[in-house]
Amino acid sequence: MKPGFKDLRAVGYQTDVPYVSLSNYCWSFNCPKPGAEVEFLNMTFQLMNSTATIVQIDADIEQSIDMVSNGSADITLVSARQTLDRMKKVDFTTPIGFVYYGYLVREIPELAVADYIMRLFDYDTLAILISFGLIIGALLYLYTWIFGLRVRSLLDWMFISCSGIIHQFMFRISSPICALVLIGFWLLCCLVIITYYEAKLKSFLLLSHHRGTIFNTLDGVLEAAEHKGWTLVIQERGYTPYLYCNPSQCARLDRLKSRINFIGADDDANLLLGQDKHVGFSALASDLAETDITYFDYHSKILFVRDKIMAPEYLAYAVNKNVKGLREKFNRAVAYTKSGYGTVRSRYIASFPSYNSVTSQSQTITVLQTSHFIQLYKFCFIFYGIAIIVFILEIIFHRMTKNFTFFGHSYNYHLSGFEWRFARPKWIHFPRRNTVILPLSKSYSPDNERRVTVC
């Protein structure tokens, strides 16, 4: 056997169960059950006919990579995420796995999910609909007062408009042109109902397939913190959303500083995550979290929910660029030992049990909020403001020029009558399956309608 490397120096965490499990009493590769990745690294060194020692410094991943980069160590004790910034400092070996970003959250009971589904309207949406009802009622009162038609009190018209909104009546106006501002407000009210009520209901019906959780993306977590009172839990030396957030998401995180609970590296995060409306951030190897939702702590009912947008990242050991031949020889050895990594890891921890393996989690759910349509509302209000200005100018012009002369010709300008009505949506008949309705005869009557059922 060819001689290998002698006295390689490995550096990393002192304790990061199940990957590293060292103590002040035993800080070497010969410790009993030193951790899955420490044992795997030692097994690979033995195949390389190499020896190594562990630098007795409790260093996190960033500190370990810096030490490998400046020559204080030769290789990391555990695998690390392979990123472009780190590749500028060190070389990476053949990946031994993947890591998935995700969120730690206590299981949400089905009753709570059902309650979340039923709470379709927020206060801002109710305020919009109520204000539209009052505006439409006031405009109806104004138009009927101007044109002297069906004079009612202001409260009566507001009650009629709100009733029409609740029943989703169609509102039709035939004249005058200036009164189209009224139908504009009516259509905007219908837009709020359709985009918020019906679309959000559909979103939550899809979301009910995701039993146990109400979000699976960073945007969903941020919306829960912004609008639903959730608290973000970030642990020192752990994974944070700043590792993978885009600029807009990072800005939202900065605005949510008051909603973030920072805890120490030695604190038990499960004590906080077991409370209502608390969510933590983590990343698990693919062999531990094999499905989209898994039990991180079965007894505490804490789930690990994979992020549906972020792609997994490689996990590999970082080696010093200046140690000639170390990476190549290590990679050749890993080609033989990699298949046994699962066996080594299973001696320390089993894969987390799947929470909902049957349910398909392939869809990315977007929970619609009123804020998603702010730009559309702005454009609508701008156009309606223009329409109101035109309406006022038309009334002023009417008052000033009832009779005017232009190039010797007399003209009369008057506003046409105000005509409006509520109309129920047309009733549409949907026949049952396998039912054929024959064409009507000329002498048709409802009593002799013929139907043929296809078997």
From Swiss-Prot:
The chain crosses the membrane at residues 127-147, 153-173, 177-197, 377-397. Glycans are attached at residues 42, 49, 70, 403. Its main location: membrane. Pfam families: SBP_bac_3. The keyword Lyase does not apply. Disulfide bonds: none annotated. Coiled coil: none annotated. It comes from Caenorhabditis elegans. This is Uncharacterized protein T25E4.2. One of its GO terms (cellular component) is membrane. Keywords: Glycoprotein, Membrane, Transmembrane, Transmembrane helix. It is a multi-pass membrane protein. It is found in: Membrane.
